[in-house]
Amino acid sequence: MVIKVPATSANLGPGFDALGLSLNLFNIITINESPIFCISLNGEGSQNLNLKKHNMFISIFNEITRKFDTKLPNFRFVFENNIPFSRGLGSSSAVIVGAIASAYKICGIKIDKNKILNEALVYENHPDNIAPAAFGGFVSSVIYKNSVITQKSEIGEDIKAVVVIPDKQMQTRKSRTMLPKNFTIKECVTNLSHAAFLTSCFVKKDYKNLKFGCIDVMHEELRMQNLPELFEVRKIAYENGALMSSLSGSGSSFLNIVYKDDAKNLAKILSAKFPKFTVKILDFDNGGFAFE
């Protein structure tokens, strides 16, 4: 059995813990019966022995299969990790969603993405990454009576993501401690209005106006102070055709959306300016996790 789970970018500026989208960059997990339990790691984290000893995917997979009381053989898990860790690209969400979906498949349970998403909420209590990891596309989410309700819009093929990935990690939990506990009504209204406008742009595929929707006054500036180069990334992106430019999740990655014809030029400029950073041109994924 093979499952692929996409990277995701959340918040998108003002949509704190509510908005996210899916990128065409996947972790691929292969699970086969084996005489003994074993794990192989390739790609991101392959040299990290702790990922073998304390593997979150295996832990969640085992927890879910035990719930179904299914007697299972030993498995060999092969992880091809392409999503960078702790860079704001949904690496933990990919693990959570992938583990739950794999457990359902192995146990013969019908794959219901809504059910899997709500199961994932137990492990990550904000849906902005887990929702697009499940469904793909641009997703807005709310939590109502402890359940996630989502709306998905497919993203057009005329735009691409130019993602800047710094060499510095940024832990979401630590990043959240930097944020104020209270906001003014003006700040809240500003973010609400921009998040609503941004959502409308994605739904209508009116990408030329994305830059007016991705403005945030609650978290981005504070988080970007950990890596001041990101302010320059945003400035350069807008000077070279970016439709929107925002911190990806809690960082450290930065998401720039451009028309596809502008992607190579922006990536070239950003790579030259920030040689220590990785710059990727990515399509958007409209499917979410999938079995192959």
UniProtKB/Swiss-Prot annotation:
What molecular function does GO assign, one term? ATP binding
* One Gene Ontology CC term in the entry: cytoplasm
Enzyme group, top EC level? transferase
Spell out the Pfam families in the cross-references.
GHMP_kinases_C, GHMP_kinases_N
Reaction catalysed? L-homoserine + ATP = O-phospho-L-homoserine + ADP + H(+)
| UniProt-listed Enzyme Commission number(s) | 2.7.1.39
Tell me where on the tree of life, at the top rank, the source sits: Bacteria
Q: Where in the cell is it found?
A: Cytoplasm
Residue positions annotated to bind ATP are 84-94
The answer on whether this UniProt entry bears the keyword Protein transport reads: no
Q: What are the recorded Gene Ontology BP terms?
A: threonine biosynthetic process
Sorted alphabetically, the keyword list is: Amino-acid biosynthesis, ATP-binding, Cytoplasm, Kinase, Nucleotide-binding, Threonine biosynthesis, Transferase
Q: Which pathway or pathways does this protein act in? A: Amino-acid biosynthesis; L-threonine biosynthesis; L-threonine from L-aspartate: step 4/5
List the InterPro entries hit by this protein, alphabetically: GHMP_kinase_C_dom, GHMP_kinase_C_sf, GHMP_kinase_N_dom, GHMP_knse_ATP-bd_CS, Homoserine_kinase, Ribosomal_Su5_D2-typ_SF, Ribsml_uS5_D2-typ_fold_subgr
Under the heading Gene3D superfamilies, the entry gives: 3.30.230.10, GHMP kinase, C-terminal domain
Q: Which family does it belong to?
A: Belongs to the GHMP kinase family. Homoserine kinase subfamily.
Q: What does this protein do?
A: Catalyzes the ATP-dependent phosphorylation of L-homoserine to L-homoserine phosphate.
Protein name, entry field: Homoserine kinase
Species of provenance: Campylobacter hominis (strain ATCC BAA-381 / DSM 21671 / CCUG 45161 / LMG 19568 / NCTC 13146 / CH001A)
